[in-house]
Amino acid sequence: MSLANQIDQFLGAIMQFAENKHEILLGECESNVKLTSTQEHILMILAAEVSTNARIAEQLKISPAAVTKALKKLQEQELIKSSRATNDERVVLWSLTEKAIPVAKEHAAHHEKTLSTYQELGDKFTDEEQKVISQFLSVLTEEFR
């Protein structure tokens, strides 16, 4: 099979795997709480800092409306709470509830496990081969911009 066909199959497999997901994580989520990947990512963001809808949308590179929808679902599950900014009552700040902390930690661990798997895969190649792979991925990424 040609390299072009392999790339096409690889990207097709990624598209199928990532359909309707914000990110690609390997393995299964270990949390018993059923959340979308966007909701999980919001929890991970809020574990690091209190944030606004607009800031979350910016970080996730999704629309504020999509964030609002995800926040509403998280609030219904009592995983997040809202408060008003002390310096501007119009600004709504979102933060985690105690119930959400273990879920957010699990999502962060899932990220680390995925990165560790990528590192293990990379370690199967020599430094020179890793440089070629890195260059290829950089060029391929530029083609998508």
UniProtKB/Swiss-Prot annotation:
Keyword Transcription regulation attached: yes
Superkingdom of origin organism: Bacteria
InterPro entries named among the record's database cross-references: AdcR-like, ArsR-like_HTH, HTH_MarR-typ, Metal_resp_HTH_trans_reg, Transc_reg_Sar_Rot_HTH, WH-like_DNA-bd_sf, WH_DNA-bd_sf
Protein keywords: DNA-binding, Metal-binding, Repressor, Transcription, Transcription regulation, Zinc
Residues covered by the HTH marR-type domain: 1-142
A Pfam family that the UniProt record links to this protein: Staph_reg_Sar_Rot
Activity regulation comment: Zinc acts as a corepressor and is required for DNA-binding activity. Binds up to two zinc ligands per monomer. Inactive under zinc deprivation.
Gene3D superfamilies from the UniProt entry: 6.10.140.1680, 6.10.250.2360, Winged helix-like DNA-binding domain superfamily/Winged helix DNA-binding domain
GO molecular function annotation: DNA binding; DNA-binding transcription factor activity; zinc ion binding
DNA-binding region(s) in UniProt: 53-76
Sequence positions that bind Zn(2+) 2: C29, E40, E106
SUPFAM superfamilies: Winged helix' DNA-binding domain
Positions annotated to bind Zn(2+) 1: E23, H41, H107, H111
Subunit structure, interactors included: Homodimer.
Protein function: Zinc-responsive regulator that represses expression of the zit operon in the presence of zinc. Acts by binding two palindromic operator sites overlapping the -35 and -10 boxes of the zit promoter. Could be a sensitive sensor of intracellular zinc to efficiently respond to zinc variations in the environment.
Entry protein name: Transcriptional regulator ZitR
Organism of origin: Lactococcus lactis subsp. cremoris (strain MG1363)
Gene: zitR
